[in-house]
Amino acid sequence: HCRAFSDNSSGFVPGTGAGLVVLKRVDEALRDGDNIYAVIKGFAVNNDGSEKISYTAPSVDAQARAIAQAQRLAGLTPQDITYVEAHGTGTRLGDPVEFSALSQAFAGASQKQYCALGSVKTNIGHLDTAAGVAGLIKTALAVQQGIIPATLHFERPNAQIDLTNSPFYINTTCQPWQPESGIRRAGV
């Protein structure tokens, strides 16, 4: 089992799958009568190049900059986002790096433990080149259905992850997604 962010994580668990999404401008999707599961308001990509910890571990600062840039482009603050679908590979090195980057990008949030943190890898394993689209599909369905799916196999946080003093909590059961604003906003 993949145990994202958990103290008993044992590493990468492969899965097999593929995913496909159709991206359209909102006005075109509305005009064409398409089913709209979610709207992407902003995104960012980067390359951490020489900042990487190692070949297998990205840079905390570079990840945090990409997350913050996506928030800015979407016109959102960390407080607006109540669910994050993380990469969450369930490795002792990768999960703390990702959590540190998220914590840095959400540093302006005044609330503690208001934002659910999940990883589809706990449900279906790491789909390699399809891992990102699997997380996007999971999140789009969560937005559309109003339910945050459970992150499975989590017992207690990795010793390098301080959930208590962060904006995040690990969502271990399916739960209704009813943010105070009434608008479901997520990061992937």
Spell out what each predicted region is.
Residues 1-188:
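Condensing-enzyme catalytic core of the thiolase-fold
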